[in-house]
Amino acid sequence: MLSRIKTFLKKEPVLGVAAICALVTVFFVLPDKEYLHYIDWRVLCLLFCLMAVVAGFQAVGFFRWLTELLLKVIRSGRALSVTLVMLPFFSAMAVTNDVALLIFVPFTLSLLDELDQRKAQIPMVVLQTVAANLGSMATPVGNPQNLFLYSAYDLGAGEFFAVTLPLTAVSLVALCAAALPVLPKALPKQEREAGASLAKGRLVIYALLFGLCLLTVLRIVPFVITTVVIVAAFLLLDRKLLGKVDYMLLLTFVCFFVVSENLGRIEAVRSFLQSLLEKNTLLTAVGASQVISNVPAAVLLSPFTDRWQDLLAGVNIGGLGTPIASLASLISLKLYMARPGARVGKFLLVFTAANLVGLALLLAFSMLI
C-alpha cells in the first residue's frame, strides 16, 4: 500500500500535495452541506472541454501546420520569442488566463520540439504562464477575480482600467525584455517536410467545438450544453482522445477548491486577514493569494475593505509567486510534466525565480504610483 502511494506521489506530485492539504483542512472544517458549493463546475467543465479540443487539434496535425506557417512568417529567433510570449498575454484579456495557456502551451512545446530548441521549453512556458496571468488583469473578463471585484464594488470601466492598465503596460515591457534572449537570434535551419498533413474535415469540426468553448468562456452558451456536445462529438469522432484529457489536473483543481474554501471558513484565518487588511490591503491581498490562490483571496477579503484599488491590484499581482497563487499556473506545470524527459525540479526553480522577479517589480511599481 505504501509503495503504491509513493509511486503515485512520484507520478503526480502536484495532486499529491493538493490532496494532503485538502485532507488537513478537513480536520478544521468538518464536511457539511457547504462542501457541495465548493466546486466550480463551470471551470472544471471548461478545462475538460478545452483539453479535449486541444487533443483533437494535435491529432489532426493542426499544431504542426501552424508551426510551419509561423516559421514562414517569422525568421528571427528573438521575434519568435516575443511573439510566443505575447500570444497568451493578449489573448488572456479576452478568453481568460487558463484558456490562453491551454491553447498556447501545447503549441509552443510542439514548435520548440520542431526547432530542436528543447532547452528553451522551460523558460518559454514559464514566461507564457506569467504573461497569461498578467495579461488577464487588463480587463474585467480576463480572470475570475476581476469579474468578481468589478461586480462586487460596482466599478465603472474608467475606474477599473485606471488601476489595471498601468500595471499591464509595465508587464508588457518587462515580458518583451525577458523574452528576447530565450531563443537564439538566428533560428537553426531545419529539414522539414514539404507541408504537414492536415485532416481538414475533422479540423473544421474541432474548430467549431473550440468556438463553442469560447462562447462558453464569454458566458453566451451554458457550460452544461458545451460539455454534453463535446463529449458526444468525441464519442462519435475519436473516443480515444477523451483519454488524452488530464483528469489528474481536474482532481488537483478540486483539491485546491476544498483547501481555499476551508481556509476561508476558519475564523482564526479570517480574523488574521482582517487585521492585516487594516494595515496594508495591497500586501495582504498579495500574501493571501500565495496561500489560497488569488480568486478565493478576492472573495475572502472584499467584505472587509473598501480599498478596492489596492485589493484589485493585489490579487492580480499576487497571481505571481507560488504555483497555486494563480491556479492557471498549474495548467502550465501539468502540461510540461506530461512531456517525455520533463525536468520538473528545474521548471519549478525557473518558475519561482521568474515569478519572484515579476512580483517584486510590480509591487515596487504599485507602491510608487
Locations of the language-model features?
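Hydrophobic transmembrane alpha-helices that form the pore/transport pathway of multi-pass ion
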Residues: M86, F90-L134, F148, V299-L312, ...
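C-terminal transmembrane helix pair
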Residues: F161-L172, L283-I369
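N-terminal membrane topogenic signal
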Residues: M1-A18, S76-G77, S197-I205
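Membrane-interfacial loop-to-helix junctions in multi-pass transporters
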Residues: W41-V43, K72-V85, E114-V125, K200-V204, ...
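Core mid-bundle transmembrane helix pairs that form the ion/substrate translocation pathway
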Residues: F160-K240, L348-L361
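Structural signal for alpha-helical transmembrane segments and their membrane-water exit/capping regions
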Residues: S3-E34, L46-G61, L180-K185, L212-K240, ...
